[in-house]
Regions:
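Gram-negative bacterial Sec-dependent N-terminal signal peptides
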Residues: 1-24
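Intrinsically disordered, low-complexity repeat and linker tracts
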Residues: 223-247
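Beta-rich carbohydrate-recognition modules and glycan-binding surfaces
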Residues: 24-227
Length: 247
């Protein structure tokens, strides 16, 4: 079967079957991944994306983990498919799509940095700090990430991707309240001294990351609360736009 990427239209029936997948919730860790060519890209936990320019639909299964306590967690991305055209029949289908290399490869945990007091708007945090400094700030509060392990599955065979944990950055790297474990980001500081060889990444079934995080329980007492992500109320008095009296 010969395939080509679909450049227009949407495989409606397949999309309908995946729209029930929920977007990432507070503290649900997920893999943010884009291949070396940016195709495919699975940048959140929704399991569905559509390229506005080309109309290409991408679907995947996001294996998430709720991170609210110290512990070891595993997250994954699997079953990646993208809209394509069978060149023999002209039929629009969802075709299995492997991931090769990486432009972006992170684990993101929404709102966790805010909840732990190690992110933007927290005392001592400075958005101008480097990724290394943001990580040291998180460590100064007792947070640490260790024992990072990356595995991938291709044609039923599991292999491990070597990773140097000493080169990983973690914390509120982007200043948005998320807790990020940055494994590789061509726009980030890991590009300069990568923790892994992106050429080692190739999978057609799943990509998996296991990590251990500590320090949460000491900060929260084992009872993490929902992070406040609401914008502060505008307390500025409205301008007086009434015309002055002349009588």
């Amino acid at each position: 079967m010969k395939l080509r990427k679909i450049m227009a239209g949407i495989v409606a029936t397949s999309v309908a079957g995946t729209m029930a997948v929920a977007a990432s919730a507070q503290y649900d860790a997920f893999i943010m991944y884009a291949s070396g060519s940016w195709y495919p890209s699975t940048m959140d936990a929704s399991g569905h994306s559509e390229d506005a320019a080309s109309g290409t639909v991408t679907e995947w299964t996001a294996g998430t983990a709720e991170v609210t306590k110290d512990g070891t967690y595993t997250v994954s991305v699997s079953g990646i498919k993208a809209s394509a055209v069978d060149e023999e029949t002209g039929e629009e289908i969802m075709a299995p799509t492997p991931g090769e290399g990486a432009a972006v490869f992170n684990v993101d945990i929404p709102d966790l940095s805010t909840a732990l007091g190690i992110g933007a708007n927290c005392e001592g945090y400075d958005a101008t700090m480097t990724a290394a400094q943001k990580m040291e700030f998180a460590k100064s509060k007792g947070i640490n990430v260790t024992d990072v392990k990356i595995t991938q599955v291709t044609d039923g065979e599991t292999t491990e991707v070597a990773v140097d944990s000493s080169k990983i950055f973690f914390g509120d790297i982007e200043g948005n309240g998320k807790f990020r474990i940055e494994l590789y980001n061509q726009f980030g500081e890991t590009k300069n001294d990568a923790p892994l060889n992106v050429a080692d990444i190739y999978f057609n079934e799943s990509l998996n990351v296991t990590f251990t995080i500590s320090g949460i329980d000491a900060i929260t007492g084992g009872n993490i609360k929902p992070a406040d992500t609401t914008a502060p109320a505008d307390t500025t008095a409205p301008a007086d736009t009434t015309a002055p009296t002349t009588g």
